């Protein structure tokens, strides 16, 4: 290859679409085309962490939760993403790290509302489950076409030299 040639990948990576319907069960991600064992356990850990936080708030601390602003069940919220309305329901996705209030492994949390005042938490919608997003599901957006919601995001990979590969070059 000479210096003035452009090398293109032989195959464009598949675009994955996540259907939104609440917390994702760990069984959904078995098989070679889905998550590895570490990510499967991450799904379980997110569910356990959120259940423990809900139990704590039931007995104490609920009066300190936000009423009009979105607040994750536990951990860290950042970068609202994919704000849209579909079939009369508003959707708000956000970067989410349930294990550390300072950030950490990034996922996408999901809230819905019919009036933009009362929001219902729907769980984690996107987990880092592929080699091209193994260190986090970063910011992106959503768009609607023909009654289908499409989510897209930036996959994060931390390289051995400490740099980040945001565009999978």
Residue ranges and their predicted role:
Residues 3-4, 14, 33-34:
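Intrinsic-disorder-associated, low-complexity terminal segments enriched in Asp/Asn/His/Tyr and depleted
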Residues 11, 22-25:
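Residue-level detector of intrinsically disordered, flexible termini
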Residues 25-31, 35-169:
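Beta-rich carbohydrate-recognition and catalytic domains
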């Amino acid at each position: 290859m000479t210096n003035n040639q452009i090398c293109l990948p032989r195959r464009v990576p598949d675009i994955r679409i996540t259907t939104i319907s609440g917390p994702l069960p760990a069984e959904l991600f078995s098989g070679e085309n889905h998550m590895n064992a570490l990510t499967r356990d991450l799904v379980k850990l997110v569910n356990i962490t959120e259940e423990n936080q809900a139990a704590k708030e039931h007995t104490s601390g609920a009066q300190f939760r936000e009423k009009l602003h979105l607040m994750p069940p536990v951990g860290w919220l950042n970068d609202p993403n994919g704000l849209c309305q579909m079939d009369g329901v508003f959707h708000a996705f956000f970067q989410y790290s349930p294990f550390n209030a300072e950030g950490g492994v990034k996922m996408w949390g999901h809230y819905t509302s019919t009036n933009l005042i009362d929001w219902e938490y729907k769980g984690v919608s996107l987990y880092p489950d592929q080699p091209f997003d193994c260190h986090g599901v970063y910011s992106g957006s959503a768009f609607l076409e023909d009654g289908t919601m499409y989510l897209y995001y930036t996959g994060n990979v931390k390289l051995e030299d400490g740099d980040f590969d945001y565009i999978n070059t």
